[in-house]
Amino acid sequence: MALVISFIPDPAKAIAEMARVVRPGGVVATYMWDTLAGGNPLAPIEAALKFLGNPSPSRLSDAASQRDTMQALWQAAGLQSVETYVIRIPVTYSSFDEFCASNIVPIGTVGQVTSKMSADEVEQLKRRLREQLPIGPDGSITYEAFANAVKGRVPG
């Protein structure tokens, strides 16, 4: 169940169902960008939108992306040997233009907000992003994104 737990209305129910259908001794696992702690690759845009007074993109169950919540959900589903860990990745763009072309698009949770913005508002967003992004001397941008992962075994 990769990168979806925050979009599920009832994560506990979904995990319980996965635990039910996986054979005894099988593994139930997921990973999700840590959306509440800024681990999402789109976190810079989300922060800029918030700074500019735009609504933060939200998912149905953002708290489910947290390691402690994942641990609790897996244990509540009766899974054993539950482990959580963090997956860290560098996010790199060759230029600010590449960053914008890849991320200010009318899809996903950020796109739900940016697609409703006027051209002036998009320019304000870009100005804010230029201020906050770590732009290197060569114009490239690199920052870290991180996801939390969890796994547990079905008893038996």
Residue ranges and their predicted role:
Residues 1-12, 34:
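A short SAM/SAH-binding and catalytic strip from SAM-dependent methyltransferases
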Residues 1-3, 29, 147:
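Short SAM/SAH-binding signature in class I
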Residues 9, 23, 154:
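Short conserved AdoMet
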Residues 12-27:
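A short glycine-rich, Lys/Arg-flanked "PGG" loop and its adjoining helix->strand segment in the class I
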